[in-house]
């Protein structure tokens, strides 16, 4: 893990009218680092991610990606800049199969001898899909099934495999194992470990304390829209994290943290 700053935010803030969903978030993520964001529902975790990825436009603040200040107009801009995100809503196309979902917006093409327009190369996309699923140990019985005909767990695994297939500059996972079974959760956690081994930085939003303690380097705690703690995972425990989440413990370094 190097000292290169992958992502930095300064005074990142989002207001919805009189509701201060996110207030003054200062955050840094280093190259190869895996950071968890924790907090109760409504604490500001997902709001923070939506500002970074361009899903929403911030009220104020600044964002840098690898040293360049960015202001994404939408999620597509963020993805083109190298940010791969697994949202809670998955963002999958129900009527498309697995290869079409993995390559949606970045389809492989081949030369068309009959005209000036290139053709979709379905064979290469299917082969790349199988290779990507094998590499991430995600088991999908039939990749030609549409997403609509898959279980919730299979859908989640497809969304995460899509993220892991394309080596990103930054991966963000928002509750990636929510409502998954034991086996599917293990598959997702295996993907996270593979990203770590590859040196790819990750932001993980999770309520799963066991998972967080097993997978990340550092834990950021949000409470009432503010960052209240920045904890080295090796120097803390679940009880300490919960104390910050509930407000039983406050971060002296963070104004308005109580």
Please describe what each predicted stretch is.
Residues 2-258:
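Glycine-rich phosphate-binding loops of nucleotide-dependent enzymes
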